[in-house]
Curated annotation (Swiss-Prot):
Domain of life the protein comes from: Bacteria
The family this protein is said to belong to: Belongs to the UPF0340 family.
UniProt-recorded name of the protein: UPF0340 protein SPD_0576
Matches recorded under Pfam families: DUF436
Length: 187
């Protein structure tokens, strides 16, 4: 698999999703990543530290330039805990948990986050504003309600299926209520 191509596809997808979601500075963005799927393997079976680092470093650069915070979801072996910067955990009141990821418990994306973040910690749960799922890792539990699917410009990064979610406020009030224009869904 060509690393330049994976980096280019990652950049394209992330920039497209950010454009479609219109996230503001300070937002939380969750990443689910299967490096095995990127390489054409089965999720959790052929993890690649190099691919994890390439993708996470690329995404951190893009989000960091916009002031958006990255949370990297781990696999079920760490109860889908997430790596964030300690400052983000404190700012959002997130519960820090005690676990350090490995290649096969947490995964390559979490290991990369520990390598490239300034002061990484694991947290149990978040409610992100949006997120990207590379390899069908199931990020929905970490995106706040109401979740809105986003169709990325590319359907795959490497060989991994790619999906994205954003969120919007709940519509409440019933038939007599009026709602502001929504940037994601037009009423």
């Amino acid at each position: 698999m060509n690393e330049t191509q994976i980096q280019r596809e990652t950049r394209q997808v992330v920039e497209d999703v950010l454009e479609k979601t219109n996230l503001k500075q300070g937002a939380l963005f969750v990443l689910g990543l299967s490096s095995s799927e990127v390489l054409g393997g089965q999720i959790g079976k052929e993890s690649s530290q190099e691919i994890g680092e390439l993708i996470v470093e690329t995404i951190l650069g893009i989000l960091g330039s916009r002031g958006i915070h990255l949370a990297v979801q781990g696999c079920e072996h760490v109860n889908r805990a997430l790596v964030v910067e300690r400052q983000v955990a404190e700012q959002f009141g997130l519960e820090i948990v005690s676990v350090h990821p490995t290649l096969h418990a947490g995964g390559s994306g979490q290991l990369a986050a520990f390598k490239f973040m300034q002061d990484p910690v694991e947290v149990e749960f978040i409610k992100a504003h949006a997120g990207l799922d590379i390899g069908d890792t199931a990020i929905g539990m970490h995106v706040k309600h109401v979740q809105v699917p986003i169709r990325p410009i590319l359907r795959e990064i490497g060989h991994a299926h790619v999906t994205a979610l954003t969120s919007r406020p709940k519509l409440i009030g019933g038939a007599r209520a009026h709602y502001p224009q929504d940037a994601i869904r037009k009423f």
